[in-house]
Amino acid sequence: MSGTRASNDRPPGAGGVKRGRLQQEAAATGSRVTVVLGAQWGDEGKGKVVDLLATDADIISRCQGGNNAGHTVVVDGKEYDFHLLPSGIINTKAVSFIGNGVVIHLPGLFEEAEKNEKKGLKDWEKRLIISDRAHLVFDFHQAVDGLQEVQRQAQEGKNIGTTKKGIGPTYSSKAARTGLRICDLLSDFDEFSSRFKNLAHQHQSMFPTLEIDIEGQLKRLKGFAERIRPMVRDGVYFMYEALHGPPKKILVEGANAALLDIDFGTYPFVTSSNCTVGGVCTGLGIPPQNIGDVYGVVKAYTTRVGIGAFPTEQINEIGGLLQTRGHEWGVTTGRKRRCGWLDLMILRYAHMVNGFTALALTKLDILDVLGEVKVGVSYKLNGKRIPYFPANQEMLQKVEVEYETLPGWKADTTGARRWEDLPPQAQNYIRFVENHVGVAVKWVGVGKSRESMIQLF
């Protein structure tokens, strides 16, 4: 019956497709992405969890941040460092996608790729797709990042401790609507050059000591434009096709972490993007119903780079031991990380914002030598227990942490490959975390390699 329809097929005036509710929902939703996010102040071992999940992923994407993130992945004894490239680029069967929420320093991107090529990374350009809406980080953004830190030091006697990669200044340009994007670089270059010059002059008027080789930078950018042109796609259409075409496994690799989020982190000592789950939707251009599992990555203790409140910090032998045993210095900056006990107030707060479906607890083996292990379970302010994580930094500096002391296991866990291999006290520690946060631990990390991530379910 082409072109005609029985009148009782549908109510008068109804158009479109008639389906049952469940089919409608499935058709409308499409595939769901799996998200890996940091649940503390970064450096939790997200790269390792991504690496595990990336082995059978079809697409691995980054949705925010820039080359201020640092992910280390060890494969076949080789250590790869990723900052801007999704760490899933190692997987030769998958496509890596840099979303619109990421800010891209092109010289940094190629430098990073070349460094990893020397370690054995091959054909990455054929597997990388870049959103045309991603903003560009220019060399002068990086210079300004350094100048702003000097200013803060002079004015307030303290700085934020940025990575000086130009991330904050680029997101500032984006919010001020003066930034330039990949799509601008790839269209009319004269128009791009004129906007680039305006942006450079604006920064020079704010920072009189700032020197910018405008012509030199434009020449380099023109060269980079041709190199990246084959990799650039409209990110919205790319993600839509990926979600609604043949079923695909899509993995999103969060950079930074919950407590560094521009809205929910320990402001102002945060990064300039949303590194909580909302940043996935805005940074890739996908709706909330396409978010599937959200895995929170947590270190078995707490670390923080740079300044800012850190309630469970241990400036003592314990802190020193955690730093030495855990090799706690930054991948991007080489700075020493401050160390302290696991803080469950932070973890519960990160769960409220992100809605974790499961946790990965990493670096459990670092606690192997301790006779007892403390865990921060609540905060007191002026002698009264407070049921929330304070937004105000001065208040957070003043909180007194209430600890629970658990027995240590004093045994080497690095050889453990199953739950049963872990000492009862280590199992008890993991169950304690689960019960207090209300989220199951899916993986436990006891070493550097892929094999040392014990999967519990």
From Swiss-Prot:
InterPro entries in alphabetical order: Adenylosuccin_syn_GTP-bd, Adenylosuccin_syn_Lys_AS, Adenylosuccinate_synth_dom1, Adenylosuccinate_synth_dom2, Adenylosuccinate_synth_dom3, Adenylosuccinate_synthetase, AdSS_1_vert, P-loop_NTPase
Cofactor mode of binding and number, as noted: Binds 1 Mg(2+) ion per subunit.
Required co-factors: Mg(2+)
Positions bound to GTP: 42-48, 70-72, 337, 363-365, 445-448
SUPFAM superfamilies to which the protein is assigned, alphabetical: P-loop containing nucleoside triphosphate hydrolases
Residues involved in Mg(2+) binding: 43, 70
Tissues expressed in: Predominantly expressed in skeletal muscle and heart, as well as in several hematopoietic cell lines and solid tumors.
Keywords: Cytoplasm, Disease variant, GTP-binding, Ligase, Magnesium, Metal-binding, Nucleotide-binding, Purine biosynthesis
TM segment ranges: none
Main location: cytoplasm
Residues bound to substrate: 43, 331-337
Disease linkage: Myopathy, distal, 5: A form of distal myopathy, a group of muscular disorders characterized by progressive muscular weakness and muscle atrophy beginning in the hands, the legs or the feet. MPD5 is an autosomal recessive form, predominantly affecting the lower limbs.
Family under the similarity heading: Belongs to the adenylosuccinate synthetase family.
Protein name: Adenylosuccinate synthetase isozyme 1
Organism listed in the record: Homo sapiens (Human)
